[in-house]
Amino acid sequence: MILTYYCIITMIIIAYLLGSIPSAVWIGKKYYGIDIREHGSKNAGTTNMLRVLGRRAALPVFLLDFLKGFVAVTLTEILKYDAYITDMWLINIKIIAVFAAVLGHIFPIFAGFRGGKGVATLVGAITGIYPPVVLLC
């Protein structure tokens, strides 16, 4: 049972660290030579990349931000093979992983706690939990 708690805490930390990957900042610096947080709305996200640098720069940022949330949630599926984890526990852990990934995107440890708004990360996480909901948006 104690090992189960360690696994849950590890999953939450992994979700936060995945969310903390500042894709907009890294793509902006590597390919365009700018820190996106110094331009436009000063957010490190897809919308600001679209406004400042256009679609070509915004698309990979959206995909990476989407994947951060999706991977963070789908990694929690590993826990369903634990004998102590019930379906209700798994849903709760997924919701906490969503929160951790979005929090990591908004306050990324790798970018000085200055990130984006978390919309693409949230959409990816919701897709990981229940894909048909995304079609309604």
Protein language model annotation of sequence segments:
Residues 3, 84-92:
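Interfacial loop-to-helix junctions that mark the boundaries of transmembrane helices
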Residues 5, 9-13, 59, 94-99, ...:
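Hydrophobic alpha-helical transmembrane segments
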Residues 6-31:
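N-terminal signal-anchor transmembrane alpha helix
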Residues 14-20, 102-112:
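Transmembrane alpha-helix interface/packing and boundary motifs in multi-pass membrane proteins
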Residues 20-26, 114-120, 136:
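Transmembrane helix boundary and interhelical junction motifs in multipass membrane proteins
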Residues 25-58, 115:
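Cytosolic, membrane-interface loops and tails of multi-pass inner-membrane proteins
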Residues 50-54, 76-80, 100, 119-137:
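Interfacial segments of multi-pass membrane proteins
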Residues 51-78:
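Multi-pass membrane catalytic core of lipid/isoprenoid biosynthesis enzymes
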